[in-house]
Amino acid sequence: MRKWMTSLLLTLLALPASAEQQKTIKDIEVHYSAFNSTFLTPKVASSYQLTRNGYTAILNISVLDRASLGKPATEAKLTGHAKNLIGNLRELSFKQVKEGNAIYYLAEVPISNEEMLTFDIDVDAGLKGAGKLTFSQKFYTEQ
């Protein structure tokens, strides 16, 4: 189960490879992806206590230590919000998931059909790096 979830999360991180959904901040690399929660199987969503429906997106962030051999995952503090085009804010609450050497931060975000959200996230990995991650993405609901 854990290997399957790790594979799924790595796949989701790799999906937008052409878009390079990552940001370098000092000695850390922040990788991110956002997707409709229906991409998760019911079993995986349940095991991580994630809501699985067509009106919830999952934000997945991993932070890697660029200064260490092999760029291992590193812990970070993440805070932030998502804002839609009319300025409504949705605070993000991140759950840390550790699987072997991997560390993921997951947040759930309610979405509406064809809604454009701008994410503003503060990433703090201590002396390794701290800064802001900002990106926008359009979401589509599933019935």
Model-derived features: positions:
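Short acidic/polar inter-strand loop motif in beta-rich domains
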Residues: 125-133
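Short, solvent-exposed, Trp/other aromatic-anchored flexible loops in extracytoplasmic proteins
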Residues: 95-120
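Beta-strand-rich domain onsets/edges
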Residues: 21-58, 140
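Sec-dependent N-terminal signal peptides
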Residues: 4-13
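Mid-chain, structured segments of secreted extracytoplasmic proteins
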Residues: 59-102
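Extracellular Ig-like/FN3 beta-sandwich strand-entry sites
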Residues: 56, 75, 114-118
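Sec/Tat signal peptide C-region and signal peptidase I cleavage site
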Residues: 13-19
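Short beta-strand edge segments in extracellular beta-sheet folds
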Residues: 97, 136-143
